[in-house]
């Protein structure tokens, strides 16, 4: 089998190779015999009798009916022929006034070029009419001279070292002499340039090469063409145009042949190389989208206070009558540098309506109320400090409308705030006492009641809207009321929030308040261990605290909290916040993907079990049907065998005979085959 397959494959390959070679030979043959389409039309005529009947033919050719044309007895025409009226051809006299348009004149000149091109070339080459007619006669008899193709010319050009030698007279052939002649002599004698093979009867189909003509020959050609109705300079211009068109056609044909050569599935690389070669010299302009310039934006200019806090604020309800400047809280009564920075920011904002800002106190820590007087009431994102035992991070978004009178916060100050804050809290202090307090806080000025659930044994001051918070605190028994030790590090968007927090809290809170409330409020909390601690008065509705793992992750990004220094600790940058958020989202997504993968595996296993059960059931059904079919065939065969038997014994019942048939081997039963 293998040898036969190899033999068949060789036969097929030979047929394919033969077919390719035959196709190449056929293409070469057709290329060789291809001619100008103008040469396909040949008109041949001979003298013959129009009438088959001799009497009618004699009557038709009698002098009564026939007459010589233009007095030539050799050329007889019928007297009813229209040429009888052409005995006298008058000379053409052009009209004095030309009524043709310039377009018609241009078309007429082009037509004259097409009509008399051969005659102009013959006149320029000095070929008489008899020579031209004789050349036409030779072409009709033997066909046109086969001109060497471009490939043959290239092959001949490569063999320049070989010398044509004839053994008869032992002289160098005339080809070398013709090659050594200068170009000026070749251009002067047009007959030699037209046809080197036949000098007596030149080939009139060869057109004049315009590029080889000098100025005198060009002028002579144009002068010869003016006698045939062409303007001065038309003939050479149209000759050059024809040559360019022929070159373009030749180039297009070469491209088509090269494309046909590279056609097929396996010649993708050749096609790419051919395309690159064609586009090599061409300058390609860049695409439109690459040329367009991107819009440029000016860098976002931040104020020093804004860049220090790295937060933005948005005021939805500005105070009517004046535009509020955005300032940021930088201190809660800490060191001199922070107080000076706060005073400078307040003086630059120019928002105050009451007293001027309090001068910075050169002393140590100041009470919380005096320190809070240095803050500006604004719609801002506040950045503050935290104590050595506490640092909290909250992100609160508020839109508040406040009124400030004097340098202090008063209980009569109304803040209309709408805040949504998210923070996560965990508190830790020196005394690790865990307590749970449940306090009720009433909001002043018609605000809603709020329940606050806290595990912090604290008495928090301040009236605010409804607040619910859960926090764990290991509260200490010693807190500082204000000054350098108590800092609250937060990033909030609340206009009326001042805080003295002793606890390290990350509470997830969210609150919304539409009622005016005093910024300072008090709340009583029932707790297991009483230890007073001032707390921030913010409008919050807390969510359950985050897990300790999240708190540890957040703690890692902050600097060490064990240093007892009064300087403000840097808060989380937006990139770190985004990184934490992305990490949490990735963890959630990983858990969800893992759960989905497990469910998918369980589902696939369940489907596989169902398919196996279905296949078992189908196999069982097929076996049952096969068994029934065999039983039917066996019964049919027993019935036929019992009819064919000569002496059927009545004592053999069907059961007995069937049991005997079953015991027989399959080789003894020719009719029963499985």
Curated annotation (Swiss-Prot):
One GO term (biological process): RNA splicing
Subunit record text: Probably interacts with CLK4.
Pfam families: DRY_EERY
Keywords: Coiled coil, mRNA processing, mRNA splicing, Nucleus, Phosphoprotein
Organism: Homo sapiens (Human)
Subcellular localization(s) per the UniProt record: Nucleus
Biased composition (Basic and acidic residues): 290-313, 590-617, 625-641
Compositional bias (Acidic residues): 182-214
Biased amino acid composition, Pro residues: 356-365
Name of the gene this protein is made from: CLASRP
Transmembrane portions of the chain: none
Ranges in a coiled coil: 585-647
Region (Disordered), start-end ranges: 171-232, 258-674
Post-translational modification, as annotated: Phosphorylated in vitro by CLK4.
Biased composition (Low complexity): 378-399, 493-506, 514-532, 642-651
PANTHER family (UniProt xref): CLK4-ASSOCIATING SERINE_ARGININE RICH PROTEIN, SPLICING FACTOR SUPPRESSOR OF WHITE APRICOT
Modified residues (Phosphoserine): 101, 285, 294, 331, 335, 547
Protein's UniProt name: CLK4-associating serine/arginine rich protein
Residue list for modification Phosphothreonine: 327, 573
Annotated family: Belongs to the splicing factor SR family.
Physiological role: Probably functions as an alternative splicing regulator. May regulate the mRNA splicing of genes such as CLK1. May act by regulating members of the CLK kinase family.
One Gene Ontology CC term in the entry: nucleoplasm
Principal location: nucleus
Ranges annotated as biased composition (Basic residues): 265-283, 411-443, 481-492, 659-674
């Amino acid at each position: 089998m293998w040898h036969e397959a190899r033999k068949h494959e060789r036969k097929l390959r030979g047929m394919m190779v033969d077919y390719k070679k035959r196709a190449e030979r056929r293409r070469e043959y057709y290329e060789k015999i291809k001619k100008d389409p103008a040469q396909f039309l040949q008109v041949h005529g001979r003298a013959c009798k129009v009438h088959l009947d001799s009497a009618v033919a004699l009557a038709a050719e009698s002098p009564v009916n026939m007459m010589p044309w233009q007095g030539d007895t050799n050329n007889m025409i019928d007297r009813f022929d229209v040429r009888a009226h052409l005995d006298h051809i008058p000379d053409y006299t052009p009209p004095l006034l030309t009524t043709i348009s310039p377009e018609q004149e241009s078309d007429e000149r082009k037509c004259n070029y097409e009509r008399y091109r051969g005659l102009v070339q013959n006149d320029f080459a000095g070929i008489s009419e008899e020579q031209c007619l004789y050349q036409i006669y030779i072409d009709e008899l033997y066909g046109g001279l086969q001109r060497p193709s471009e490939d043959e010319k290239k092959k001949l050009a490569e063999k320049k070292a070989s010398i044509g030698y004839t053994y008869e007279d032992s002289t160098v052939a005339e080809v070398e002499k013709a090659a050594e002649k200068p170009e000026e002599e070749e251009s002067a004698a047009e007959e030699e340039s037209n046809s080197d093979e036949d000098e007596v009867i030149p080939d009139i189909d060869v057109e004049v090469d315009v590029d080889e003509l000098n100025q005198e020959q060009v002028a002579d050609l144009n002068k010869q063409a003016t006698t045939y109705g062409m303007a001065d300079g038309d003939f050479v211009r149209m000759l050059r145009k024809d040559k360019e068109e022929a070159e373009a056609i030749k180039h297009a044909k070469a491209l088509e042949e090269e494309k046909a050569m590279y056609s097929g599935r396996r010649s993708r690389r050749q096609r790419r190389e051919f395309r690159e070669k064609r586009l090599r010299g061409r300058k390609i302009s860049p695409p439109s989208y690459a040329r367009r310039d991107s819009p440029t934006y000016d860098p976002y200019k931040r104020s020093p206070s804004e860049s220090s806090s790295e937060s933005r604020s948005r005021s939805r309800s500005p105070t009517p009558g004046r535009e509020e400047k955005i300032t940021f809280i930088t201190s809660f009564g800490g060191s001199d540098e922070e107080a000076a920075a706060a005073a400078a920011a307040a003086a630059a904002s120019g928002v105050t309506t009451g007293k001027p800002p309090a001068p910075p106190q050169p002393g140590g820590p100041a009470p919380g109320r005096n320190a809070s007087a240095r803050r500006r009431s604004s719609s801002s994102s506040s950045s503050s400090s935290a104590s050595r035992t506490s640092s909290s991070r909250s992100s609160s978004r508020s839109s508040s409308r406040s009124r400030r009178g004097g340098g202090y916060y008063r209980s009569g100050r109304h803040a209309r705030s709408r805040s949504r804050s998210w923070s996560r809290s965990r508190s830790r202090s020196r005394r690790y006492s865990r307590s749970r307090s449940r306090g009720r806080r009433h909001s002043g000025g018609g605000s809603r009641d709020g329940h606050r659930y806290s595990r912090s044994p604290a008495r928090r001051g301040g009236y605010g809207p409804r607040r619910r918070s859960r926090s764990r605190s290991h509260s200490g028994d010693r807190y500082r009321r204000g000054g350098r030790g108590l800092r609250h590090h937060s990033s909030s968007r609340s206009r009326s929030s001042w805080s003295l927090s002793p606890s390290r809290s990350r509470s997830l809170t969210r609150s919304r308040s539409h009622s005016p409330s005093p910024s300072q409020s008090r709340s009583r909390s029932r707790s297991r261990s009483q230890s007073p601690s001032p707390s921030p008065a913010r409008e919050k509705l807390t969510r359950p605290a985050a897990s300790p793992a999240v708190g540890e992750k957040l703690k890692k990004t902050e600097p060490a909290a064990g240093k007892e220094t009064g300087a403000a600790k840097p808060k989380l940058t937006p990139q770190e916040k985004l990184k934490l958020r992305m990490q949490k989202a990735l963890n959630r997504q990983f858990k969800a993907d893992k759960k989905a993968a497990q469910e998918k595996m369980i589902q696939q296993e369940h489907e596989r079990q169902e398919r196996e059960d279905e296949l078992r059931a189908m196999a069982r059904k097929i076996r049952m049907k096969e068994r029934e079919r065999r039983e039917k065939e066996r019964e049919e065969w027993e019935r036929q065998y019992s009819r064919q038997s000569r002496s059927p014994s009545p004592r053999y019942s069907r059961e007995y005979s069937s049991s005997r048939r079953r015991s027989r081997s399959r080789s003894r039963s020719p009719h029963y085959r499985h």
